């Protein structure tokens, strides 16, 4: 039935800040485009929809991310701070090699982590950090 997850779409209020954040993580831009028209209104079930999107990928992988900024109708936010235990979509996990060096590099870029690197069942090292728009991300290294 399904072949794979094609991409993850994130709606953001600051498209440039979100793009810059994911570029720091090693994503590259595949495409940037303004979206509008009857086809979009129907797909997203919103009247007079106009949005801009940036398609990103991690080079040499099938990891695809779409950042979307809706200009009309403007999106809203529920105002809650992202917490790991909130119901619904919670985080994006990125597999890395040498998690320690990745954390050091990202800290140099100004990224703040929830905690130091933790080890789960001697199988995986991991840590969480906060991205743009309250998105929680995880770094994971399998042992």
Language model features with spans:
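N-terminal beta-strand motif that seeds the catalytic metal site of vicinal oxygen chelate
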Residues: 1-19, 28-33, 89-94, 143
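A short, acidic/glycine-rich surface segment
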Residues: 37-42, 74-80
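Active-site/binding-pocket entry motifs
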Residues: 62, 71-74
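Active-site-proximal beta-strand elements of phosphoester/diester hydrolases
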Residues: 67-69
């Amino acid at each position: 039935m399904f072949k794979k997850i094609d991409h993850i779409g994130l709606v953001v209020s600051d498209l440039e800040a979100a793009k810059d954040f994911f570029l720091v993580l090693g994503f590259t831009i595949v495409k940037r485009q303004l979206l509008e028209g009857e086809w979009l209104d129907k797909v997203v079930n919103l009247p007079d929809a106009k949005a801009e999107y940036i398609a990103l990928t991690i080079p040499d992988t099938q990891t695809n991310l779409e950042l979307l900024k809706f200009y009309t109708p403007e999106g809203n936010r529920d105002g809650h701070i992202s917490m790991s235990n909130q119901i619904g979509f919670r985080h994006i996990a990125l597999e890395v090699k040498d998690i320690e060096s990745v954390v050091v590099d990202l800290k140099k870029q100004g990224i703040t982590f929830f905690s130091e690197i933790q080890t789960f069942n001697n199988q995986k090292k991991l840590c969480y950090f906060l991205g743009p728009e309250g998105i929680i991300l995880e770094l994971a290294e399998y042992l």
